[in-house]
């Protein structure tokens, strides 16, 4: 579960390396984000000579969490890190590659571009 002040790794080649969540979008009274939720984040670490810089406010989609995700068939999916993909206002990824695995739940939320870029779908 991702909440405000949580640090996340960036799982794409957009230039950002670490994000800090400052807001969960569309949460209402819920203050936490799970896989597939959109967050507002600040870039805390960035690669040099890339379009995204530190202290820039961006939108991102959470693709992996340390908190387990329970599916209806009984399968439990858990990751070693919290990771996100930086997106633009239309929901398309800013990078051209996605590193690591993503879950099938992103397909239901219409993030098919992220799924097509990922090397592994769980």
Curated annotation (Swiss-Prot):
GO terms under biological process: translation
Gene3D superfamilies: Ribosomal protein L14
Recorded GO MF terms: large ribosomal subunit rRNA binding; structural constituent of ribosome
A single GO cellular-component term on record: chloroplast
Location, primary (coarse class): plastid
Pfam families in the record: Ribosomal_L14 (PF00238)
InterPro entries: Ribosomal_uL14, Ribosomal_uL14_bac-type, Ribosomal_uL14_sf
Subcellular localization(s) per the UniProt record: Plastid, Chloroplast
Keyword terms of this UniProt record: Chloroplast, Plastid, Ribonucleoprotein, Ribosomal protein, RNA-binding, rRNA-binding
Superkingdom of the organism of origin: Eukaryota
Quaternary data: Part of the 50S ribosomal subunit.
Functional description taken from the UniProt entry: Binds to 23S rRNA.
PANTHER family named in the record: 50S/60S RIBOSOMAL PROTEIN L14/L23, LARGE RIBOSOMAL SUBUNIT PROTEIN UL14M
Family under the similarity heading: Belongs to the universal ribosomal protein uL14 family.
Name listed for the protein in its UniProt record: Large ribosomal subunit protein uL14c
The species this protein was found in: Cryptomeria japonica (Japanese cedar)
Gene: rpl14
């Amino acid at each position: 579960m991702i909440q405000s002040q949580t640090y996340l790794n960036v799982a794409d080649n957009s230039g950002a390396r670490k994000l800090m969540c400052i807001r969960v979008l569309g949460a209402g009274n819920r203050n936490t984000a799970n896989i597939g939720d959109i967050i507002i984040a600040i870039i805390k670490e960035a690669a040099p000579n890339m379009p995204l810089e530190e202290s820039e406010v961006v939108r991102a989609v959470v693709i992996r969490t340390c908190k387990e995700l329970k599916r209806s068939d009984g399968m439990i999916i858990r990751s070693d890190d919290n990771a996100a993909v930086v997106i633009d206002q239309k929901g398309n990824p800013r990078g051209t590659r996605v590193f690591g695995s993503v879950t099938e739940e992103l397909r239901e939320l219409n993030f098919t571009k992220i799924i097509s870029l990922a090397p592994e779908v769980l």
